[in-house]
Each structure stands twice: as structure tokens, then as C-alpha cells.
Design a protein with these regions (language model features):
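Canonical Rossmann dinucleotide-binding motif of NAD(H)/NADP(H)-dependent dehydrogenases/reductases
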Residues: 2-35
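Conserved glycine-rich Rossmann-like NAD(P)H-binding loop of the short-chain dehydrogenase/reductase
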Residues: 30-46
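Conserved NAD(P)H cofactor-binding loop of Rossmann-fold oxidoreductase domains
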Residues: 92-97, 236-237
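Substrate-binding pocket helix/loop in short-chain dehydrogenase/reductase
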Residues: 100-101, 108-113, 199
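Catalytic loop of short-chain dehydrogenase/reductase
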Residues: 138-164, 169-177, 190
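Short, small/polar-rich loop/turn modules that mediate ligand/substrate recognition or access, typified
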Residues: 177-181, 227-230
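C-terminal substrate-recognition "lid" of short-chain dehydrogenase/reductases
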Residues: 210-234, 239
Length: 241
């Protein structure tokens, strides 16, 4: 049977890093096929599909709200049906909001944990079961230098969610080995957050260089055979300060 190329599911693919991953990876390997998850960015995803399809790249959209955690198993099955399998899962979708620790409500905490930690956990659980059966698969979790190596004031619930995702990466890499490799990427200050009232990005690094390095790191992990349980900091050394 002819190999149809790796099938890659990217969550939060319509904007920011997710969008750049689609654009970058589609240039590196024309055989990749993409499942593009979105929630509120249908126009952006369709525009992205139109753009890469001009180069012969196949991509299919799928809408889902990760706050509906009880429906993630159904979402995973629907995503797998689009091409018949998923070879690579990239957990990229996340919420980034500032709020003082003593002002965080139960709803604030639940939403942050549901989208940034619980959703990747459940999605990885359901999709990896098929990967294990096929004895092949990759999972890449996008964490953050915030919550992994350092913390920011007023972002406690965000830091907790990303720190938990980093720990989850290591646990999954042990439990799913040797057939599924699980790694994480922890970007630094790359793209200014949307609607952020905090002036945290005065000294953020060259976005183009950072995005290129992130895309190349993802490509390395997609194609690697012997990298498992690692966290790749792509932050120009920011986490050392």
C-alpha cells in the first residue's frame, strides 16, 4: 500500500504558533497531511488551507471547544476518521490570561486547567491508544518557559497548567514507550500575547528566527526515532535569566 505521508493533528492551528507550524512544516515536507483543529478561528483556518493547498498540501479542518472535556473522546475519533489515522499529535492550543492569585475564581482555574492540561491529557490518551496498536506515533506538547523553568506574577493558574503539562510529558514518555515518543517544546517570549495588559514583551526576541527554530525543532521530533521524554527550550537562553 502506498504511503500517504504522515498525518499531523495540530490543535489551535488557526493562529500564532499553530498557524506558523502548518506553514513551516508544509514547506519542509510536501507529503505531510494536516488535521487543523480550531474553535473560534474558522476563517483563519480556511484561509490557511487555501494557501497551502496551492502547493499541493492536503489539510482538513475540525472544530472543537476543549472546554467540553467530556466530548474529547468523540472529537479524537472524528479527527482520526478524516484520514484514517493520526501519526503525530501536536498539543498546541492553550489559554493565556493574567489574573492576581487571590482574584482567580473557580471558573478561571477550571478553564485554564481544562484547556491547557486536561484536554491534552485526554486527547493524548485516546489518540495514543491507536498509535500503540500501530506501534508508531509521536506526541509533542507545547509547554512554556513560564511554568517550566520560571514563573510570572499574576499568571499562577497559567504557570500551574504548563508545569503540569511538562510533568505529563515525562510520565507519558515512560508509559507509551517504546512505540510512541512524547516530547515537549517550551518557547520563550516569541509572539506578543493578544489583549495582554502586561508590558512583558519589551525585550522579546526576533520572532522570525524564533518561529523558524520552533518549526525545525518540531520537524526533528516528528522524524526522530530515538528522542523521548525531552523538553526543548526555544527561548534564546531566556530561561537562564
Amino acid at each position: 500500500m502506498k504511503d500517504i505521508g504522515k498525518i499531523i493533528l495540530i490543535t489551535g492551528s488557526g493562529r500564532r504558533i499553530g498557524k506558523e507550524l502548518v506553514l513551516g512544516l508544509s514547506k519542509i515536507d510536501k507529503n505531510y497531511k494536516f488535521i487543523l483543529h480550531y474553535n473560534n478561528s474558522s476563517k483563519e483556518v480556511q484561509s490557511l488551507i487555501n494557501k497551502i493547498s496551492k502547493d499541493g498540501i492536503s489539510a482538513k479542518p475540525i472544530k472543537f471547544n476543549f472546554l467540553e472535556t467530556e466530548k474529547i473522546e468523540s472529537f479524537a475519533h472524528e479527527a482520526e476518521k478524516l484520514y484514517g489515522r493520526i501519526d503525530v499529535l501536536i498539543n498546541n492550543a492553550s489559554i493565556f490570561k493574567a489574573k492576581k492569585f487571590n482574584k482567580i475564581s473557580n471558573k478561571d482555574l477550571d478553564e485554564m486547567i481544562d484547556v491547557n492540561l486536561k484536554a491534552p491529557f485526554l486527547l493524548s490518551k485516546f489518540i495514543s491508544s491507536q498509535m500503540v496498536k500501530r506501534k508508531n506515533g509521536k506526541i509533542i506538547n507545547f509547554t512554556d518557559s513560564i511554568g517550566v523553568t520560571k514563573t510570572w506574577k499574576d499568571y499562577s493558574h497559567y504557570c500551574i497548567s504548563k508545569g503540569g503539562l511538562e510533568t505529563m510529558t515525562k510520565v507519558m514518555s515512560l508509559e507509551l514507550a517504546p512505540y510512541v515518543q512524547v516530547n515537549s517544546i517550551a518557547p520563550g517570549k516569541i509572539l506578543k500575547p493578544i489583549n495582554s495588559s502586561k508590558n512583558l514583551y519589551n525585550n522579546f526576541y526576533n520572532s522570525n528566527d524564533a518561529i523558524n527554530d520552533i518549526v525545525n525543532t518540531v520537524y526533528l521530533l516528528v522524524e526522530s526515532k530515538f528522542i523521548n521524554g525531552e523538553s526543548f527550550k526555544v527561548d534564546n537562553g531566556e530561561s537562564l535569566t
